[in-house]
Amino acid sequence: MWLSACLCLVLSFLGGVNGTCPSQCSCEYHGRHDGSGSRLVLCNDLDMNEVPANFPVDTSKLRIEKTVVRRLPAEAFYYLVELQYLWLAYNSVASIETSSFYNLRQLHELRLDGNSLTAFPWVSLLDMPHLRTLDLHNNRIASVPNEAVRYLRNLTCLDLSSNRLTTLPPDFLDSWSHLAVTPSRSPDFPPRRIILGLQDNPWFCDCHISKVIELSKVTDHAVVLLDPLMVCSEPERFQGILFQRVELEKCLKPSVMMSATKITSALGSNVLLRCDAKGHPTPQLTWTRSDGSTVNYTVIQESPGEGIRWSIISLTSISHKDAGDYRCKAKNLAGISEAVVTVTVVGGVTTTLSPDSSERSPGEPPEQHPQPGLGGSTPPSKSWLSPGLTSAPSYPTPSAALYTSTWSPPPSSLPPIFSAASATTSVQTSISGRTARTSHQPPLLHPGGKSNAKIEKNGRKFPPLSASKKEELALLDQAAPMETNVTIKDLRVARETGVSVTLMWNSSSSTQESSVTVLYSKYGEKDLLLVNADDYGKNQATINGLEPGSQYVACVCPKGVGPREDLCITFSTNRVEGRGSQWSLLLVVTSTACVIVVPLICFLLYKVCKLQCTSDPFWEEDLSKETYIQFETLSPRSQSIGELWTRRHRDDGERLLLCSQSSVDSQMNLKSDGCRTEYYG
């Protein structure tokens, strides 16, 4: 009897849960021909102030709209395991618990538009792994926290329009960065896109939303704005201006530079990897492995100036587990950029110490043993820019790279660049299975503690490794170049012109021509040029771009090994005959011009001086030849008509006229008789 009562109670409860519809809601069941179906529940009673607790468990779509529900309690829908659509639009919801959507693992669409939310529990998205649409339109949300970015990855539609947002986290759009690199699964289907609604918010246009501003200016992107015609509210100079017309002056996405893309190193050696970045604001640099894990090696990072930052990672005593990709990621408010370098580890390591090493004093460096095939000379020490330091750097483009090396051959007649002193080798490591050796040498530093290593790629100089910094010097001292066993002899000049020269040599190795490196420089200069790999041939190389009539020094050495005296040659380029004839023609033209112009100038000067000296007598002579009107003087006393009109002598009239016009003539006449006035009476 008791068992039957309990059974009836359980059945009645299950029946109420499965089939009972809340009194303030309406429930509809839509069946299909295959016997399956879906249940729709609609609750829009204006008097409803809380979420009912007895929805049918097979509900697939629940709509609670236009009610006065103000709060979503914890686990409000936990038993609706088949729920796919939850619409809570145009209510009065002001708060949501973190666990309000617990157990809604099949939910595809969540709409909370038209409520009074000031915040959303973003962590609750973990309880809804299949959620694709989240509508928070027309609420009072004022900010999106930085931690929300990690939960947005699975969303395909996010509507935050008509809220109170002024800015967004810098990494907001990075939530969907995987879509930019993931190719489409099939050519018949378009790539997956994200719909993002951000319009009708009082945006403050600065670097924090620079990515959104740039997004509004492009059309083909994985993330599509629901309304690209968004406007700025602040600052005042951007107020009312469309995102598409805003130009932010101090926002620059980082650019990352690495001096090599592939590094091959011996097992147990040390490698330095360097990364340089520029951007505004000044970017932050992080190193990660290909699997996303952080790097557990010493990392040095420094910002020498605003907008510039570099970072160095030291891989000491590397093993095969250290091989792989190393990513340098630069990040600031304007965006993220990264560069990748691949490290390859080869060989096995055995350390060989000379028999008399124990007899030396602790402070005395060990003696270096000559290597076979190298003529017993001391291997040069070379200062390289990291990464590399164990092999010749590999560049993405085949363009020639300019770098400065410090060599240490024995004294010879070579130019001063080949006479620098270097540190001796302290350890020799043999690589099993290969006839190669690794010489661990510290880079040579100039007085003052600064290294002269530098590289120029594609015409752009990379800065030195800031060797003045103690930490960086400590890392540089651990670097080691790798020397391959290639014997080169009989280096000679096969052909030379005014602008190029062809070098030939004999090699006892069966390796390809790419196993050697050709360096050259103008005689007496310190900057060495690396010959382009495209100019290499079988045991020969062509150096182009030389100056006619100049002296150069060229060296051929195995890749990763510095130049030696016996592998270098001095040559001079031919003089261009055409240039001499041009100079001769120019000299003839100049001489002819001087012969013609100089006498003409002298003649003109003579004429000018002559005119200046003869100007006064010339004018006096002209005045004397002029004809003047003769004047008669009337006497004030009574005279006869004959006497009154009696003409005076011509010379006296002329003298009277000149006396009234010229002071000089007046003085002369006064001395000789004066200007007498004659009266006839």
Swiss-Prot record:
Gene3D superfamilies to which the protein is assigned, alphabetical = Immunoglobulins (2.60.40.10), Ribonuclease Inhibitor (3.80.10.10)
Membrane topology designation: Single-pass type I membrane protein
Q: Biased composition, Polar residues: where in the chain?
A: 378-391
List the carbohydrate attachment sites.
N18, N296, N485, N506
List the residue ranges of the region (Disordered).
Answer: 350-391, 425-464
Q: What sequence ranges are listed for the domain Ig-like?
A: 254-344
The record's listing under InterPro entries reads: FN3_dom, FN3_sf, Ig-like_dom, Ig-like_dom_sf, Ig-like_fold, Ig_sub, Ig_sub2, Leu-rich_rpt
Q: Where are the LRR repeats?
A: 56-79, 80-103, 104-128, 129-151, 152-175
Instruction: Keywords in alphabetical order, please.
Output: Cell projection, Disulfide bond, Endoplasmic reticulum, Glycoprotein, Immunoglobulin domain, Leucine-rich repeat, Membrane, Repeat, Sensory transduction, Signal, Transmembrane, Transmembrane helix, Vision
Residues assigned to the Lumenal compartment are 20-584
Q: What range does the record give for the signal peptide?
A: 1-19
Any idea what a deletion of this gene does?
Answer: Viable. Retinal anatomy is grossly normal, although thickness of the INL is reduced. In addition thickness of the innermost region consisting of the inner plexiform layer, ganglion cell layer and optic nerve fiber layer (IPL, GCL, NFL), is reduced. Optomotor responses in dim conditions are impaired. Electroretinography shows completely absent b-wave response under dim conditions, and milder abnormalities under bright conditions. Abolishes ON-responses and delays OFF-responses in retinal ganglion cells. Rod photoreceptors show normal morphology.
The primary location reported for this protein is: other
Relate the protein's function as given in its record: Plays a role in the synapse formation and synaptic transmission between cone photoreceptor cells and retinal bipolar cells. Required for normal transmission of a light-evoked stimulus from the cone photoreceptor cells to the ON-bipolar cells and ON-ganglion cells in the inner retina. Required in retinal ON-bipolar cells for normal localization of the cation channel TRPM1 at dendrite tips. Seems to play a specific role in synaptic contacts made by ON-bipolar cells with cone photoreceptor pedicles. May also have a role in cone synapse formation.
**Would you tell me the protein name for this molecule?**
Leucine-rich repeat, immunoglobulin-like domain and transmembrane domain-containing protein 3
